[in-house]
Amino acid sequence: MSRVKGGTVTHARHKKVIKAAKGYYGRRKNTFKVARQAVDKANQYATRDRKNRKRNFRALWIQRINAAVRSHDEALTYSRFINGLNLAGIEVDRKVLADLAVHEPEAFGAIVRQAQDALAA
């Protein structure tokens, strides 16, 4: 049985890792062993932060909605506004509400009035 040398496969694998480490500082960009560790850690951060991004954007939307609601009515809080939306049967998610609050304040004001009417009733 002849000897099987894995040089091309190993070279391709190393090249893939070095390519992923492009732009890194020091030995992390051109030494396979160090680059592999750096790329693995970067992938861990990327996985974690894909989860955190959802959390961060939801918090941002809530802050924007709260600020816009308070600019329309000082006494109305975010939680009471959301309660008013539920009572009024308005099913709009926070992403759309935040976008309306920033780009179309008049339309958002109409939604705030509907929520207030539902709370008063």
Curated annotation (Swiss-Prot):
Superkingdom classification of source: Bacteria
UniProt xrefs under SUPFAM superfamilies: Ribosomal protein L20
GO CC term (a single one): ribosome
A Pfam family annotated for this UniProt entry: Ribosomal_L20
GO biological process: ribosomal large subunit assembly; translation
GO molecular function per UniProt: rRNA binding; structural constituent of ribosome
UniProt keyword terms in alphabetical order: Ribonucleoprotein, Ribosomal protein, RNA-binding, rRNA-binding
InterPro entries xrefs: Ribosomal_bL20, RIBOSOMAL_L20_CS, Ribosomal_protein_bL20_C
Reported function: Binds directly to 23S ribosomal RNA and is necessary for the in vitro assembly process of the 50S ribosomal subunit. It is not involved in the protein synthesizing functions of that subunit.
Family: Belongs to the bacterial ribosomal protein bL20 family.
Protein name: Large ribosomal subunit protein bL20
Species: Ruegeria sp. (strain TM1040) (Silicibacter sp.)
Species lineage: Bacteria, Pseudomonadati, Pseudomonadota, Alphaproteobacteria, Rhodobacterales
Gene: rplT
